[in-house]
A protein has these predicted regions:
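Short, basic-rich loop-to-helix N-cap that marks the start of a DNA-contacting helix
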Residues: 32, 57-72
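Short C-terminal boundary/hinge segments that cap the last helix of small helical domains
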Residues: 74-84
C-alpha cells in the first residue's frame, strides 16, 4: 500500500501548473509578444519546450527561474503569474 505524505493532491498541483501556464500566456499575448521572443529572452533555445510549458502539455512546466525571467521579460510582478 502506497502512503501519500503530500499536503496537496495531484489534481491541486495540476491545477496550479495550469494556472501558471494560463497566466504566462495571457500576459504574453497582452504584451503582443511571441513565444519565440520570450523563450529566447529567458534562455530557452527550444521553442517547442517553451510552447509545451505554456500550454501545459506532456507534463512540462516552468521552473522558478523561468518564471522570474518571464516576469522580467514581460515587465510584470512575478506574483501575477501565480494568481488564480
Amino acid at each position: 500500500m502506497e502512503v501519500d505524505f503530500s499536503n496537496s493532491s495531484k489534481e491541486e498541483i495540476r491545477f496550479f501548473y495550469q494556472t501558471i501556464s494560463h497566466n504566462v500566456k495571457k500576459y504574453r499575448l497582452e504584451k503582443g509578444l511571441s513565444q519565440e521572443k520570450i523563450a529566447l529572452d529567458i534562455g530557452i533555445k527550444s521553442i517547442a519546450f517553451y510552447s509545451n510549458c505554456e500550454n501545459n502539455r506532456y507534463d512540462k512546466h516552468f521552473n522558478l527561474e523561468h518564471l522570474y525571467k518571464i516576469s522580467k521579460s514581460l515587465d510584470i510582478d512575478l506574483s501575477l503569474l501565480l494568481k488564480r
